[in-house]
Amino acid sequence: MSKATYRRFDPWRAAPVTEESRETILSGHYFDIDRTSFDSRDIGHFDRLIVHKNNGDSVGVIGLTDDGLIPLIEQYRIPVHRWTLEIPAGHAIKQGERPLDVAKRKFAEEVGYEAEHLTQFCRFINNPSYSTQYTALFFASGLKAVHGGNDDDALMSSVRYFTPEEAFHMVKNGTILDAKSIIAIQRVYFAPNHMVGDEHLG
Protein backbone atom coordinates (compact mmCIF):
# COMPACT_ATOMS: atom_id res chain seq x y z
CA MET A 1 0.00 0.00 0.00
CA SER A 2 1.34 3.39 -0.93
CA LYS A 3 2.31 5.73 1.89
CA ALA A 4 1.98 8.79 -0.32
CA THR A 5 -0.14 11.63 1.00
CA TYR A 6 -2.08 13.95 -1.25
CA ARG A 7 -2.69 16.90 1.07
CA ARG A 8 -1.13 19.94 -0.52
CA PHE A 9 1.81 21.21 1.53
CA ASP A 10 1.06 24.54 3.18
CA PRO A 11 3.90 26.01 5.27
CA TRP A 12 1.57 28.66 6.71
CA ARG A 13 -1.26 26.46 7.99
CA ALA A 14 -2.31 26.81 11.65
CA ALA A 15 0.49 26.16 14.14
CA PRO A 16 0.14 23.23 16.58
CA VAL A 17 1.57 25.37 19.41
CA THR A 18 0.70 28.70 21.02
CA GLU A 19 3.40 31.13 22.13
CA GLU A 20 2.71 32.28 25.69
CA SER A 21 5.71 34.44 26.59
CA ARG A 22 9.12 35.53 25.37
CA GLU A 23 12.15 36.88 27.26
CA THR A 24 15.37 38.09 25.63
CA ILE A 25 18.25 36.61 27.63
CA LEU A 26 21.10 37.72 25.35
CA SER A 27 21.16 40.63 22.91
CA GLY A 28 23.89 41.17 20.32
CA HIS A 29 24.50 43.08 17.11
CA TYR A 30 23.77 40.14 14.80
CA PHE A 31 21.31 38.12 16.87
CA ASP A 32 19.27 37.89 20.09
CA ILE A 33 18.56 34.75 22.10
CA ASP A 34 15.05 34.47 23.54
CA ARG A 35 13.64 32.05 26.08
CA THR A 36 10.18 31.38 24.68
CA SER A 37 7.33 29.52 26.40
CA PHE A 38 4.81 27.52 24.36
CA ASP A 39 1.70 25.48 25.02
CA SER A 40 0.62 22.49 22.95
CA ARG A 41 -2.51 20.39 23.13
CA ASP A 42 -0.41 17.27 22.62
CA ILE A 43 2.57 17.82 24.93
CA GLY A 44 1.53 20.68 27.21
CA HIS A 45 3.79 23.51 28.35
CA PHE A 46 7.44 23.71 27.25
CA ASP A 47 10.26 26.23 26.78
CA ARG A 48 12.69 26.74 23.90
CA LEU A 49 15.75 28.92 23.34
CA ILE A 50 15.41 30.62 19.94
CA VAL A 51 18.08 32.59 18.10
CA HIS A 52 16.52 35.62 16.39
CA LYS A 53 18.61 37.03 13.56
CA ASN A 54 18.94 40.83 13.41
CA ASN A 55 19.61 43.04 10.36
CA GLY A 56 17.94 40.87 7.73
CA ASP A 57 19.30 37.92 5.77
CA SER A 58 22.86 36.74 5.83
CA VAL A 59 24.33 36.87 2.33
CA GLY A 60 26.82 34.72 0.43
CA VAL A 61 28.31 35.43 -3.03
CA ILE A 62 29.95 33.06 -5.49
CA GLY A 63 31.50 34.29 -8.73
CA LEU A 64 33.67 33.23 -11.63
CA THR A 65 36.63 35.28 -12.81
CA ASP A 66 37.33 35.77 -16.53
CA ASP A 67 39.59 32.72 -16.44
CA GLY A 68 36.89 30.57 -14.84
CA LEU A 69 38.09 30.51 -11.23
CA ILE A 70 36.05 30.73 -8.03
CA PRO A 71 37.50 33.06 -5.38
CA LEU A 72 37.19 31.58 -1.89
CA ILE A 73 38.24 32.93 1.49
CA GLU A 74 40.66 30.82 3.51
CA GLN A 75 40.12 31.90 7.10
CA TYR A 76 40.48 30.73 10.66
CA ARG A 77 37.13 30.24 12.39
CA ILE A 78 37.49 30.48 16.16
CA PRO A 79 34.25 28.66 17.20
CA VAL A 80 35.23 25.46 15.32
CA HIS A 81 39.00 25.83 15.87
CA ARG A 82 39.92 25.24 12.24
CA TRP A 83 40.69 26.89 8.93
CA THR A 84 37.86 26.95 6.41
CA LEU A 85 37.32 27.73 2.73
CA GLU A 86 34.20 29.84 2.20
CA ILE A 87 32.53 32.04 -0.35
CA PRO A 88 32.49 35.77 0.53
CA ALA A 89 29.65 36.46 2.95
CA GLY A 90 28.30 38.91 5.49
CA HIS A 91 25.42 40.85 6.99
CA ALA A 92 23.81 44.25 6.69
CA ILE A 93 25.70 46.90 8.66
CA LYS A 94 23.10 49.65 8.49
CA GLN A 95 19.33 49.95 8.48
CA GLY A 96 17.81 49.40 5.06
CA GLU A 97 20.85 47.76 3.45
CA ARG A 98 19.38 45.19 1.06
CA PRO A 99 20.79 41.68 0.53
CA LEU A 100 21.83 42.80 -2.97
CA ASP A 101 23.73 45.73 -1.45
CA VAL A 102 25.41 43.44 1.08
CA ALA A 103 26.43 41.05 -1.71
CA LYS A 104 27.99 43.88 -3.71
CA ARG A 105 29.86 45.28 -0.69
CA LYS A 106 31.17 41.97 0.67
CA PHE A 107 32.37 40.70 -2.71
CA ALA A 108 34.45 43.84 -3.18
CA GLU A 109 35.71 43.92 0.41
CA GLU A 110 36.64 40.27 0.73
CA VAL A 111 37.93 39.25 -2.69
CA GLY A 112 38.50 42.58 -4.44
CA TYR A 113 36.01 42.41 -7.33
CA GLU A 114 33.07 44.48 -8.46
CA ALA A 115 30.31 42.59 -10.26
CA GLU A 116 28.39 43.95 -13.24
CA HIS A 117 25.60 41.48 -12.48
CA LEU A 118 24.46 39.95 -9.19
CA THR A 119 21.71 37.34 -9.35
CA GLN A 120 20.06 35.74 -6.33
CA PHE A 121 19.69 32.01 -6.98
CA CYS A 122 18.86 30.56 -3.57
CA ARG A 123 17.49 31.45 -0.13
CA PHE A 124 17.42 28.99 2.75
CA ILE A 125 16.83 28.72 6.51
CA ASN A 126 20.12 27.96 8.25
CA ASN A 127 18.66 25.79 11.02
CA PRO A 128 14.89 26.03 11.58
CA SER A 129 15.08 23.94 14.76
CA TYR A 130 16.41 26.85 16.82
CA SER A 131 17.05 29.90 14.60
CA THR A 132 15.20 32.45 12.45
CA GLN A 133 18.26 33.09 10.27
CA TYR A 134 17.93 32.99 6.49
CA THR A 135 20.80 33.13 4.00
CA ALA A 136 20.46 34.53 0.47
CA LEU A 137 22.98 33.35 -2.13
CA PHE A 138 24.05 35.41 -5.15
CA PHE A 139 26.01 34.67 -8.31
CA ALA A 140 28.41 37.43 -9.39
CA SER A 141 29.35 37.86 -13.06
CA GLY A 142 31.05 40.50 -15.18
CA LEU A 143 33.82 40.86 -12.62
CA LYS A 144 36.21 43.80 -12.51
CA ALA A 145 39.20 43.86 -10.16
CA VAL A 146 39.16 46.71 -7.62
CA HIS A 147 41.09 47.54 -4.49
CA GLY A 148 40.00 45.18 -1.72
CA GLY A 149 40.35 41.66 -0.45
CA ASN A 150 41.03 40.49 3.10
CA ASP A 151 39.24 43.53 4.51
CA ASP A 152 38.22 41.90 7.78
CA ASP A 153 40.63 40.05 10.06
CA ALA A 154 43.32 40.22 7.38
CA LEU A 155 45.85 38.34 9.50
CA MET A 156 43.49 35.35 9.66
CA SER A 157 42.29 35.22 6.04
CA SER A 158 43.47 35.15 2.43
CA VAL A 159 41.90 34.79 -1.01
CA ARG A 160 42.37 31.49 -2.86
CA TYR A 161 41.26 30.60 -6.41
CA PHE A 162 39.92 27.25 -7.59
CA THR A 163 38.26 25.83 -10.69
CA PRO A 164 34.67 24.64 -10.19
CA GLU A 165 35.97 21.07 -10.52
CA GLU A 166 38.57 21.61 -7.79
CA ALA A 167 36.04 23.27 -5.49
CA PHE A 168 33.49 20.49 -6.04
CA HIS A 169 36.14 17.85 -5.32
CA MET A 170 36.84 19.58 -1.98
CA VAL A 171 33.12 19.47 -1.21
CA LYS A 172 33.03 15.74 -1.91
CA ASN A 173 36.10 14.89 0.14
CA GLY A 174 35.06 16.99 3.14
CA THR A 175 37.64 19.76 2.82
CA ILE A 176 34.91 22.38 2.38
CA LEU A 177 32.36 22.05 5.20
CA ASP A 178 30.64 25.44 5.22
CA ALA A 179 26.99 24.93 4.25
CA LYS A 180 26.41 28.08 2.19
CA SER A 181 29.62 27.43 0.25
CA ILE A 182 28.66 23.80 -0.43
CA ILE A 183 25.28 24.87 -1.83
CA ALA A 184 26.81 27.60 -4.00
CA ILE A 185 29.67 25.47 -5.34
CA GLN A 186 27.35 22.61 -6.28
CA ARG A 187 25.02 25.01 -8.09
CA VAL A 188 27.91 26.43 -10.15
CA TYR A 189 29.31 22.96 -10.83
CA PHE A 190 26.05 21.30 -11.90
CA ALA A 191 24.23 24.24 -13.52
CA PRO A 192 26.82 26.75 -14.76
CA ASN A 193 24.59 27.92 -17.62
CA HIS A 194 21.64 28.80 -15.37
CA MET A 195 23.25 31.26 -12.97
CA VAL A 196 22.91 34.67 -14.62
CA GLY A 197 19.55 36.43 -14.38
CA ASP A 198 18.22 39.94 -14.88
CA GLU A 199 19.23 41.56 -11.58
CA HIS A 200 21.80 44.19 -12.59
CA LEU A 201 23.77 46.64 -10.55
CA GLY A 202 23.95 50.25 -11.54
Regions found by a protein language model. Give the residues of each.
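Helix N-cap/coil-helix junction residues
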Residues: E97, G112-Y113, I176
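Conserved beta-strand segments that form the floor/walls of ligand-binding pockets within enzyme
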Residues: P71, E86, K106-A108, T119-Q120, ...
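Active-site-adjacent beta-strand/loop module that shapes the phosphate/pyrophosphate-binding cleft
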Residues: S37-D42, N127-H147
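Short, well-ordered beta-strand micro-motif
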Residues: R35-S37, G63, F139-S141, Y161-T163
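Acidic, metal-coordinating catalytic segment for phosphate/diphosphate chemistry
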Residues: R22-I62, D66
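Conserved Nudix-box catalytic region and its N-terminal flanking loop in Nudix hydrolases
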Residues: K3, N55, G60-R105, D153
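A short coil-to-beta-strand element that immediately follows conserved catalytic motifs
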Residues: E19, E114-F121
